[in-house]
Amino acid sequence: MIELGVSLCPFFLAALFEIRGGYLICLWLRNNMRAVFGPLGRLMLAVCGIIPTFQPSHFGRVYAAHGGIFIVFSLIWDLFVDKKIPDRYDHRGNNNVCGCFHYVLRLSLIGRYSVISFCNFQTPRQRISDFFLSRSIKHNFYLFFCNQTLGNYFV
C-alpha cells in the first residue's frame, strides 16, 4: 500500500501545481490581482509539466492517469477553495468521464486494447475467464489496487 502512495504522489503534486497555477493566472487576469500572480502561475504550470516526467511509463499513459486525478482534484478545489458546490453539469461531466474509464476497463479485459492489466494473464481469454471465475470481481479490484505499483497498472 505504501508503494501505491509513493506512485500516486507525483500525480497529486502535478494536479495541485496545475490547478494552483491556473487559479493564480485566473485571479491575475479576471480579478485584476497583483502582477506577481501571473508569473508565479506560469512557473507553477511549468513545474506541473515537469513533475510527470518522474513516472517510468510513457507520456500518453502518464497524462491519461494525470487527467483522471486532475478532474477529482479540480472538484475538490472548487468545493473547498472557491466554496462552490458542484452542480448537475459537474456531476454529468464526471459521470461521462467515469463511463469512459469503465469502457476502457472493459476493453482491456476483453483484450482489444491492453491499456490496463488487472492481473498478469497472458491471453485475453485467460484474462476474462480468470477475472470472472476467481473469488469475486471485488477481490480482483482489491488485488489490482493494493498489490501493484502505478507503473505496473499500464501494460
UniProtKB/Swiss-Prot annotation:
Cited InterPro entries: UPF0060
Membrane topology reported for the UniProt record: Multi-pass membrane protein
Transmembrane segments: 8-28, 35-55, 62-82
A GO CC term assigned to this protein in UniProt: plasma membrane
Recorded superkingdom: Archaea
Localization terms from the record: Cell membrane
Classification via Pfam families: UPF0060 (PF02694)
Main location per the UniProt record: membrane
Keyword terms, alphabetized: Cell membrane, Membrane, Transmembrane, Transmembrane helix
Annotated family: Belongs to the UPF0060 family.
Protein's UniProt name: UPF0060 membrane protein MA_3936
Origin species: Methanosarcina acetivorans (strain ATCC 35395 / DSM 2834 / JCM 12185 / C2A)
